[in-house]
Every structure is written in structure tokens, then in C-alpha cells.
Amino acid sequence: ILYRRDQVILKNNFRKEYKFVTDIENSGKYLDWITKNSVLLFPKRTVQSMYYDTLDFSLYKNSVFDDTDRFKIRFRNYKETPEKIFKEIKKNSRDGKFKTSESTNYKNFDEIGNLYFQGVQYYPKSFVSYTRQYFLKNNSRITYDTNIIYRTGIKKSNKFYNSNKVIIEFKLDDSQKL
């Protein structure tokens, strides 16, 4: 695998994303296919995200029942640089997905409280951590997520759960097809 540090910049801000979930036991064949003739975009790193929602989980419900015109709010960092936390809003429209990301002054997730967005109050609802690998294959960006752990809520007393799944995601600009 070649290693490439420069980021892939899409021609526009919208992209299509296709997500596949598989068991760890079956994931090796997919990783073999991905790594063959691909370029490694970044070193493997640990992603940590805190997701926000309303008290009645309206964002989650929209993501389950609506295919477009929805959004996610999260704070994210990379374990290798924990002092950098980003606020991200990921919107899904008929044209594709669009993500905004802005650096914050937070030093850890415990400092982040509730937030207002578009006149609505949102609360931290779940925390997830996973190891991510980033590849470029045939002009498509592919992410490969393993070691997934998660907990509901943000209280440190809440139990973490381990997932035996691997998530593979293809990220394509408008002109590409899977």
C-alpha cells in the first residue's frame, strides 16, 4: 500500500456515502480487496465522537425514517491529538451529504455541555470510539472502522459496549458511482 498524506479534495462539497456493516470474522476479505491497489491517506487513528440529540431523540428518529433532509451534530477528536476537538454538523440532502467542521476551544469532552442549533436545544446522547483506516481506491475514499466501542449518555459511570462489527464506508463525489 502506498501512503499519501495530502487530503483528497472533492470538486464540490456534496458527496454520496455508502455504508456497509459486517462481522469481524468476515471483514478480512473486504480489507484485502480495499488494500489491493489502494493508497493509504492517513495513518490508522482512533476517532472519538460525542453525538447530540433532542430529549425525544428527534435527530435519531429522522435518520431512521427519513432518507434525506436530516442532520447530525457531533463533537469529534482524534485520540492522537486529544486537545483538538471539532464541532461538526453533517447534513444529508437530496444532493448528497455536506459536512461543516469547526475547531473549538474545548480540551476534553467533559467541558462540553448542551448546545443550541437553529433555535433548538440539543444534549449529549452517545459517545463512540473506533479505529479508522483511510484509503483511496479508484478515486473513491474508503474508510474502514474497527474496535468500535460505545456508550449511551456521557456519564463516565455508563458502561461501554464492544461491537463485533466492522463498518466500511465509500465516500464518492456527485460524479462517481459505486
Question: What are the roles of these predicted feature ranges?
Answer:
Residues 2-178:
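Phosphate-end processing signature that detects enzymes handling 5′-triphosphorylated RNA
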